[in-house]
Amino acid sequence: MGTSEQVIADLREPTRVLRRAAPGAWAGFATLHDEAMKDGALDAKVKELMALVAAVVKHCDGCIAYHAKAAARQGATSEEVAEALSVALLMDGGPSTTYGPRAFAAFEEFTQQRPAREDPGQPVADGHEVPVAAS
């Protein structure tokens, strides 16, 4: 298991516990996530790249892992991720020289796990594991 996959795995159980403790808030977040990340004027891949940049600027390792994985699943290329991360560097300065490479390494990790797609023009369901309210 790679470093970023381990970040996601480490968050899985604590997230389940918190989701059970505050199901309404988590259900609301899941709805917000689904609405914000669906294809629209911007496709889901572009939105995942935007989220990855935001994760770098916010210095959120868990967010970086989730959105790097989702960007890989959406078919983002290394060139697209590198270009997006240059915007993070512009907006965040020095700290992005640490978090940007983490994000790029996470993307590369998940790209290695990405199965070959028969039709690269078709989007894949995003890899973000949005915790939804448990009944």
What are these model-derived regions, one by one?
Residues 1-48, 98-135:
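Acidic, glycine/proline-rich low-complexity segments that act as flexible tails and inter-domain linkers
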Residues 33-34, 51, 68-72, 86:
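Amphipathic alpha-helical segments within well-ordered protein domains
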Residues 41-58, 79-88, 118:
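Immediate flanking context of iron-sulfur cluster ligation sites
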Residues 60-63:
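Short cysteine clusters
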Residues 86-103:
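Short Fe-S-cluster ligation motifs
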